[in-house]
């Protein structure tokens, strides 16, 4: 039985991989960095990626020793692997693809390119030198890798085109609220959720006068959010998609959720806060004018961005978005066409099976 090792470090990558691997891979032994969802479809866990997942240089320091311990475990398991699928997570995977090549892994696939177009463009060269295939999920990324003749580059669209769809009917969703719902997305990692709760606590009370503020999140964070902000949380699968389809506007921490909201046609404000040192270093390195993929793809600031800004500035930004929601919604309508046609998951599954 051929062996596939999965290396990933965040929930978005896990969601895409879950959808791809849940059918057609019965003849393969798949193991690696996992979560509960991946384990349910038979992926064997070497470690949970949540143990090493973090954002920013300063934020990562407390997890260094844990990371090194898990990394040694990964290398031990890679020795008899036929295929490595490295998903995004450049801090982990750019080192891992080099070590995998040294260990004699036959086939190395990089799925979801690091954002080399935003910063550290030399990472593309590292991927080209150590990988056999790169599968990109943004239309303009294919061009970046075309200059490397020995690397096979693939693009079939963005998985979110298939995945972003409502789970409940509007009537079923709305009956839980007395006021208009206002989705609040705080992030997917514990550190960023804690920072954003602290940042937004002051304006949530103000917003609750006019809206039912709801926070779609993961089960492990729901009690903390409910206790600190006194808002309702939603933890069922696809809750954020229902929020985006059935609300007029949202407050969203920068990340995949902004693109999901954009695909759903939901006007929103993008905010984010990191350690000041991380922000200072990042600002010097990043080469793109926007942080949200929505704005990058549409080539203008359709959804306003508030990075390292005060809660009052974020509140004013939200009020402006809410007033202009129809205009913003119209501009968001072109995103699906930019990101590819439907059946992206099926095409990715077929591509992976062809490669491995």
UniProtKB/Swiss-Prot annotation:
Protein name, as recorded: Lipid-A-disaccharide synthase
Keyword tags: Glycosyltransferase, Lipid A biosynthesis, Lipid biosynthesis, Lipid metabolism, Transferase
Pfam families linked to this entry: LpxB
Segments crossing the lipid bilayer: none
Record NCBIfam families: lpxB
GO BP annotations, alphabetical order: lipid A biosynthetic process
Pathway(s) where this gene product acts: Bacterial outer membrane biogenesis; LPS lipid A biosynthesis
UniProt function note: Condensation of UDP-2,3-diacylglucosamine and 2,3-diacylglucosamine-1-phosphate to form lipid A disaccharide, a precursor of lipid A, a phosphorylated glycolipid that anchors the lipopolysaccharide to the outer membrane of the cell.
Keyword Lipid metabolism in record: yes
Organism: Aquifex aeolicus (strain VF5)
């Amino acid at each position: 039985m051929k062996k596939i090792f999965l290396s990933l470090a965040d929930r978005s990558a896990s969601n895409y991989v879950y959808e791809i691997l849940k059918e057609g891979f019965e003849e393969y032994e798949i193991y690696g960095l996992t979560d509960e969802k991946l384990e349910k479809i038979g992926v064997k866990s070497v470690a949970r990626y949540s143990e090493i997942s973090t954002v920013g240089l300063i934020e990562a320091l407390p997890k260094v020793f844990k990371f090194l311990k898990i990394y040694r475990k990964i290398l031990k398991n890679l020795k008899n692997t036929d295929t490595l699928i490295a998903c995004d997570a450049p801090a982990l995977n750019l080192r891992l693809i080099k070590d995998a090549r040294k260990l004699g892994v036959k086939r190395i696939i990089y799925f979801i390119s690091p954002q080399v177009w935003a910063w550290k463009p030399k990472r593309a060269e590292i991927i080209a030198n150590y990988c056999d295939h790169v599968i990109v999920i943004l239309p303009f990324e294919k061009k970046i890798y075309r200059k490397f003749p020995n690397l096979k580059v693939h693009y079939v669209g963005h998985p979110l085109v298939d995945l972003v769809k409502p789970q409940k009917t509007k009537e079923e969703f709305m009956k839980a609220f007395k006021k208009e719902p206002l989705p609040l997305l705080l992030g997917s990692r514990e550190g960023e959720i804690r920072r954003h709760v602290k940042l937004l606590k002051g304006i949530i009370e103000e917003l609750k006068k006019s809206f039912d503020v709801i926070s779609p999140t993961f089960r492990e964070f729901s009690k903390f959010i409910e206790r600190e902000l006194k808002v309702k949380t939603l933890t069922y699968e696809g809750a954020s998609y229902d929020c985006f389809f059935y609300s007029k506007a949202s407050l969203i921490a920068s990340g995949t959720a902004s693109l999901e909201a954009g695909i759903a046609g939901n006007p929103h404000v993008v905010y984010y806060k990191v350690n000041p040192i991380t922000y200072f270093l990042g600002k010097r390195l990043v080469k793109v004018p926007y942080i949200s993929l929505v704005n990058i793809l549409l080539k203008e600031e359709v959804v306003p961005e508030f990075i390292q800004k005060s809660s009052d500035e974020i509140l004013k930004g939200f009020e402006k978005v809410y007033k202009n929601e129809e205009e913003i919604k119209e501009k968001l309508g072109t995103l699906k066409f930019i990101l590819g046609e439907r059946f992206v998951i099926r095409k990715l599954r077929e591509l992976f099976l062809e490669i491995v």
